[in-house]
C-alpha cells in the first residue's frame, strides 16, 4: 500500500511540475574549459584553510549520515525478533518521527546560521549525532525509558541532519565565488554523500558484522541482541564525539552575521 501511495503522489507531483513557470538558463558569454565543465575548478577551494577544514569535516560527518541511513531502520525493525511490544511491531512509526523532525528542523536552520554562524551550527549537528547514536544505544521497546530514548533519537535526527546538510550548503554558497557556485555545491555533495558515505558504509558494516552476529542467523538470547546493538551504537556515538571535539579545536572561522543575512538562497 505504501508503494502505491508513493507512486500516486509521484505521478501527481510530476504532473504538477508541468504547471510551474519556465525558468530559462542564464546565458553566459564566458567560455569554460573542460575542468570547469566537469566541476573540477571547485577543488581550488582547498587552498583556503577554512574551506579545506570544512570539506574534510563534511566528509567525516558524511560517515555519520551513512551510519544512520544504513542501520537505523534495520535496528528499529529488528526489535520485532525479540519483543512483542507495540513499538517493536510498528517500527514505521518510529522511523517516521525522524522524517517529521527533519521537515520541521529545516525551518530553524537559517535562523541559527545567521545568529550563531557555521561553526556553532555544525557543532550542534555533531553533538546531535552523538545523542542520536547514544539514545539508540540505551533504547529498547520494553521499558518506558527505553522507548523514550528511541523517540528522542528520532527527534534529534532532524537537528543532526538539517543543521549539517542544509546549513553546510548555505555556507558553501556564501563562501564560494559566484563563478563556481554549482561546482562548489557538487564538491560538498561529493565529500558527504560520496566519499563520506562510502567510508561510512564500509566501516559501519564492519562494526555491525563484528558485534551483531545474529545478522547471520546466530541470535541466541535477548541479552546478546541488546549487548550487540548497544556496543555498536556506543562506538558510533564515540566516533561522532571525537569528530565534534576535533572540529571544535581545528576549525577557525569568524562569523559575519551581516554577510549571512544578505545572502540569497
Language model segments and positions:
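Pair of pore-lining "gating" transmembrane helices in MFS-fold secondary transporters
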Residues: 47-68, 155
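Helix-to-loop junctions at the C-terminal end of transmembrane segments
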Residues: 104-118, 208-209
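Multi-pass alpha-helical transporter architecture, strongest
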Residues: 12-21, 212, 229-265
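Juxtamembrane intracellular "pre-TM" segments in multi-pass secondary transporters
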Residues: 21-54, 81-82
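C-terminal ends and interior cores of transmembrane alpha-helices
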Residues: 127-143
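Intracellular juxtamembrane helix-capping segments at the cytosolic ends
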Residues: 163-177
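A membrane-interface helix-boundary motif in multi-pass transporters
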Residues: 1-8, 206-240
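Short amphipathic helix-loop junctions that connect adjacent transmembrane helices
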Residues: 70-91
